[in-house]
Amino acid sequence: MPKPSLTFFCEMDGIALAALFQDGQVLTSLKKLGANLSLGMLDLSEKRAEVVKKLNRAGVPVTAWLLLSKERGYWTSLDTVQETAQQYGEFKQWQEKYKLAFAAIGLDIEPRIEIMSALSKNPGRETLSLLKRFIVSSDPLDFENEAHALIDHIRSDGYAVETYQFPLIVDERMARSHVLLKTLGLPSLNSDREVLMLYSSFFPVQADSLLWSYAKEAQAVGVGSTGGGVEIAGMPPLKTLRWIDLKRDLLLASKAVKHVYIFSLEGCVQNRYMDRLCNLNWQTEVLPPEKPAAGIWIIRRLFQGLMWAFSHPFDAILGILLVNTVWNFLRRITRA
């Protein structure tokens, strides 16, 4: 299988980022891999600008991964699309001030960070809160239109747009559902590249089967985690992948997509995976878990049906009544 295009996520503050790139070894590894960097904009500091300049001079393509402060929700969703638009404006001023070059803009589509924290601390109570939100929330179309308008605005500035999505967005789309949209504020956006975050660290059981099930339907795949990332109150950190598991996920993903993203650069450096990545034989044979993935697909289809029913309750009720009527009619004919 051919070597895919690799992109590393990096989510560090300006001081830690400057230290990571201080000796030039990380930059050398990125160049050797021909890799891109999706750089989380945790701040718009001079130190971050200096690192971007190093990457520009070395010819390493950089994506500006837009992030908010924790107080503003941290990630992009329908709840924070206005804040993300404001952050993009501030980013543009910073980029122009330091004359920096970026290949794309990344939007991380996740719920507000306090929702993630609440789901971890008290899942029962927060689930009820989200169910109430689904029932009583107004039409999210206006906010969804704002998200599409933001993407159009970014494109008009000459940037490609990447979106980083939970894999469930694929099921929502296939089910023609709006459950994730109305509960968690997660829109399905028409970006230039959608990256499904298929981190085995999220799924301790059947991780490879889940990855394979979704990867075959993806434009690009994110694997990990090798460490790093934001701390969420009440939520334990993601389990760090062993090299053997990261290698498996990379090889599996490369059989399905041409673009693979690794979370995170700092984790790979800390765990001394960079040299192994540089020397990885992409022709190494790996057997896709077809049978377990088929089981995952059945579960996904059932879940999609449930999402459709929640999103179209009247249609679902009419369908049940119709099936019941036909069934009773057939029973009468059989008895006669």
Q: Which residue stretches match the model-derived regions?
A:
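Aromatic-lined carbohydrate-recognition surfaces of secreted/lumenal glycan-active proteins
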Residues: 4-13, 63, 135-180, 195-200, ...
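Catalytic domains of carbohydrate-active enzymes, especially glycoside hydrolases
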Residues: 4-8, 14-46, 97-105, 187-194, ...
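Substrate-binding cleft of secreted/luminal carbohydrate-active enzymes
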Residues: 6, 190-209, 213-332
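Anion (oxyanion) recognition and catalysis
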Residues: 31, 56-58, 155, 254
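Active-site-adjacent "subsite" loops/lids of carbohydrate-active enzymes
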Residues: 48-97
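Active-site groove signature of glycoside hydrolases
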Residues: 90-137, 260-262
